[in-house]
Amino acid sequence: LSEKMDIAALSYMEQLGTRSDPSRDPSQRTVATAYLGLVPAQVKTTIPAYAQWVPVDNLPQMAYDHADIISEGVDRLRAKLSYTNIAFALAPPDFTMAELTHLYQAALGHEVSPTNLQRVLSRRGQLAPTGQRKAPGTKGGRPARRFRFTKQTLQVTDPFAILRPS
């Protein structure tokens, strides 16, 4: 993927699994090892004309078992967002809670309360304020505080947690 999509800045990668079902490719026996790779939101990529980013809930028709592999990756990410600090791999170095909430909502596929998200992540020791604030917008109001993740490596933060729609 990094060669085809000009993505050199993977912030996290793990093996999803190896598939070797004899019927996965009707023309020959193939073995495929799939990986979950995360790219930080702020990374800009050059996408070739033959490719495009698509929402995971609106995938095009795919060959073989590729849709199943993607579904497995999405499920793995969603689960890990509940009990680890894996969001560090999606977020920029510093962010507002609104920006982080947007990342969680996009990954989880449902609404997330910014207040509850901040409370949970702070209680787990995942967030630290940077002391900076976002530049004020045109609508006025208090500028949003900026945060960063305390760790940039994967850690289990709550082995019994689950984030789900209320």
Regions found by a protein language model. Give the residues of each.
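NUDIX/MutT-family hydrolases
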Residues: 34-37, 44-81, 90-98, 102-103, ...
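A short beta-turn/loop motif at secondary-structure boundaries
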Residues: 23, 92-94, 137-139
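Positively charged, solvent-exposed patches that mediate nucleic-acid binding
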Residues: 110-136
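Short helix-coil junctions and helix-kink-helix linkers
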Residues: 102-111
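Active-site segment of metal-dependent pyrophosphate-handling enzymes
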Residues: 2-45, 79-87, 124-133
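Non-catalytic, surface-exposed connector residues within folded enzymatic/regulatory domains
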Residues: 29, 63-64, 111, 115, ...
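Long, intrinsically disordered, low-complexity Ser/Thr/Pro-rich regulatory/activation regions
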Residues: 129-166
